[in-house]
Swiss-Prot record:
Pfam families: REV (PF00424). This is Protein Rev. The keyword Magnesium does not apply. Homomultimer; when bound to the RRE. Multimeric assembly is essential for activity. Residues 16-24 are annotated as: Homomultimerization. A motif (Nuclear localization signal and RNA-binding (RRE)) lies at residues 35-49. The gene is rev. A motif (Nuclear export signal and binding to XPO1) lies at residues 71-82. It is found in: Host nucleus, Host nucleolus; Host cytoplasm. GO terms for molecular function: DNA-binding transcription factor activity; RNA binding. It comes from Human immunodeficiency virus type 2 subtype A (isolate SBLISY). One of its GO terms (biological process) is mRNA transport. Transmembrane segments: none annotated.
């Protein structure tokens, strides 16, 4: 009967603490910056008061003590490390063995591309020149001076007589 009364007392205390927390909602974001800041400060002061009051209403019991160090050491001593088999010495031996331990299975990294097949990440591999490159492309063709870098529209050539002091 005392356990049930203790449980009911704990529940009553926790309900009271929950009610206290519900009576202090976080402030809404209306008003000027100063008004919002002051509301947050007042809310934080009330929140600290509620925490102090809740701590007086119900103090949580201490957690159970850690197991003694001797017991922990004994548990660690009971652990064993399995010895790993030697890795295969040749590639053929590795292929003929049907069941290799997962430790020695060869894994190829995904980021290593093959000899320029299917991997077109760099401008060199795409055959494009970087900005300010030479006047020829990889095929040896010279670029047209009337095309912009995108090569999609024609631009008229600029002559010295078109530029005057007024335009500068």
């Amino acid at each position: 009967m005392t356990e049930r009364a203790d449980e009911e007392g704990v529940r009553r205390k926790l309900r009271l603490i929950r009610l206290l927390h519900q009576t202090n909602p976080y402030p809404q974001g209306l008003g000027t910056a100063r008004q919002r800041r002051n509301r947050r400060r007042r809310w934080e002061r009330r929140w600290k008061q509620i925490l102090a009051l809740a701590d007086r209403i119900y103090t949580f019991p201490d957690p159970p003590a850690d197991p003694p160090l001797d017991q922990t050491i004994q548990q660690l001593q009971g652990l064993t490390i399995q010895t790993l088999p030697d890795p295969p010495t040749t590639q053929r031996l590795a292929e003929t063995q049907g069941s290799l331990p997962a430790v020695w299975v060869r894994v190829d990294p995904r980021s290593v591309p093959g000899p320029r097949e299917g991997y077109k990440r760099d401008s060199y591999e795409r055959g494009e020149e970087l900005v300010g490159g030479s006047g020829t492309n990889r095929k040896g063709d010279t670029r047209s001076s009337t095309k912009d870098q995108a090569g999609s529209r024609n631009c008229p050539p600029v002559r010295d007589r078109d530029i005057s002091k007024e335009t500068l």
